[in-house]
């Protein structure tokens, strides 16, 4: 299936900026990938001494394969990029558009455990405006990949800059990393904040402060 114009534009912008997730061509269909992942997960679980003949575990390798391809890593495939509605700014909107408390669940690419958090996204309309729900969908698309939070934040920024044809975009993500919470240091209370600021959000202290410190 051919990629949408929006998907191609976003992918090209990320590649140009060196911000694309490290990926190599697979050459397999979605179902072929599921079959391969299922086979490997069966081997991994067997090496962990789990009895895959038990009715509770028998379908686990297939469940994991479907979850990886269709759900939590679906953002690796640009065929899943959301349908985007960008329209001309005929109303002349020139004040900040801000969407906050966007829920996101991603996966740490170092340990493949959960990243759980929220995003705040804002832009100053120029020539184009975007349907508000599309901002949430773009955040979700890039979250559905193995990620590091810093790259995720930048990817959302660059995607919106490319689609809206303006640098005036800002993104902030607050998240809990389960690679910190459930293993290693096992810190259950810390969280991580990352920001990506473009255009006037970076160059103008007042606009930056309005974005970063606006009351909830």
From Swiss-Prot:
Keyword terms of this UniProt record: GTP-binding, Hydrolase, Metal-binding, Nucleotide-binding, One-carbon metabolism, Zinc
Catalytic activity: GTP + H2O = 7,8-dihydroneopterin 3'-triphosphate + formate + H(+)
First-level EC class: hydrolase
Keyword field contains Zinc: yes
GO molecular function terms noted in the UniProt entry: GTP binding; GTP cyclohydrolase I activity; zinc ion binding
Top-level taxon: Bacteria
Alphabetical list of Gene3D superfamilies matching this protein: 1.10.286.10, 3.30.1130.10
Single biological process term from Gene Ontology: tetrahydrofolate biosynthetic process
Pathway(s) the chain acts in: Cofactor biosynthesis; 7,8-dihydroneopterin triphosphate biosynthesis; 7,8-dihydroneopterin triphosphate from GTP: step 1/1
Protein EC: 3.5.4.16
Claim: Chaperone is one of the keywords in the record: no
Binding residues annotated for Zn(2+), in chain numbering: 108, 111, 179
Any one Gene Ontology cellular component term annotated for this protein: cytoplasm
Protein family per UniProt: Belongs to the GTP cyclohydrolase I family.
Subunit structure as annotated in this protein's UniProt entry: Toroid-shaped homodecamer, composed of two pentamers of five dimers.
PANTHER family listed in its UniProt record: GTP CYCLOHYDROLASE 1, GTP CYCLOHYDROLASE I
Name of this protein: GTP cyclohydrolase 1
Organism listed in the record: Shewanella amazonensis (strain ATCC BAA-1098 / SB2B)
Phylogenetic lineage: Bacteria, Pseudomonadati, Pseudomonadota, Gammaproteobacteria, Alteromonadales
Gene name linked to the record: folE
